[in-house]
């Protein structure tokens, strides 16, 4: 998956970028807008150009924080440089994240935008695509998910730990996740009456049991 920008390329030595849609591999950087590269695909010309894009994931930019499969798409959540971004692959083609022209089966990329920081800490495929961030829990809907139908809505404001990864788990149809506070475990459950998710504190009557959990499992 690719992100187009005019960002500095000083940390991109060894990375592949695209110039006018053609691949080159950066071998040296001499300035914020100047680099030497090995041509991997024949270029249309040799003139300077601002038409370039860089891989969203690399040693320079960071790697996906979390992943899951949902509706025949691979879902990647967050990275070091793009902590609130979601990427969904092409339907049925888990390695193709190209958004193309926005056709129903093509790749999808979007950011969680709100009034607070939302670094993605987990994604989970349940009744809907669920996204767990450092500050809230979200529901991604669309039947099926397409670039035109996708909708994103914040459900609750509990938050997940930022200093360690604790993947959420399915427990009898509900999603259980560790709270950012380190003193609670919540059940993220959908209610038909409210047509929304609720986060119920499962440690409410035994707070002393939960102290900075590091992993969860359910059998």
Language model features with spans:
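Beta-propeller and closely related beta-pinwheel folds
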Residues: 47-219
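Short, small-residue-biased leader/transition segments that mark boundaries at the very start
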Residues: 1-9
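Ser/Thr/Gly-rich low-complexity blocks that favor extended beta-strand/coil architectures
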Residues: 10-35
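Short, surface-exposed beta-strand/loop "edge" segments at domain boundaries and coil↔beta transitions
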Residues: 10-11, 43-47
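A generic structural motif
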Residues: 5, 31-42
